[in-house]
Amino acid sequence: MMEIDKKFITKLLSEAAENPRLRQNYDLRTSSDDNSQRMLNALLPGTVVPIHRHPNSTENVLLLHGKLAEVLYEEERLGDGIEPGDGIEQKPDKAIGRHLHETARIVMDPSSGSYGCIVPAGTWHTVEVLEPSVIYESKDGKYGEDGSETV
């Protein structure tokens, strides 16, 4: 049995402080054959988590320690400047660029009664770390094989 207690959280945060990325994860899966992701993630202010999405899975995020904001975005596809009737074949699924605009910011802080969130599949998101924090996160699919995309 493994106990996730104050001592373990403190150790994980110390490891994050020594990591140049200012974060450290701890894999909670019991086997590499497990087709899911379940982990603890220690995050320090200043860490950069790129805006990303998981097209095929929701992401469950529970804050165990600290304070952070889960930031959600909506994608606006930007066209290529070609007007209908120009005689050039248009491919509506191939936008030249994209613009993301913030749609929600969920501040998780156990002292204020906010403990976590579920990010819908396909939603662009990131986190802003407001205090040293540890989250439990889970989603479907093996890491690196789940179809995740970054901006």
Predicted regions: what they are:
Residues 4, 8, 13, 96, ...:
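Double-stranded beta-helix
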Residues 40-55:
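Conserved short histidine dyad/triad with adjacent acidic residue
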Residues 56-78, 92:
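Glycine- and acidic-residue-biased ligand/ion/polar-headgroup-sensing regions
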Residues 40, 60, 126:
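Short, surface-exposed charged micro-motifs
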Residues 75-85, 89-122:
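Short acidic-glycine-tyrosine-enriched beta hairpin
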Residues 1-36, 50, 81, 92, ...:
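A short, N-terminal "cap"/entry segment at the start of jelly-roll beta-barrel domains
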Residues 50-52, 70-71, 117-119, 125-130, ...:
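Short beta-strand His + acidic residue motifs that chelate non-heme Fe in jelly-roll/DSBH
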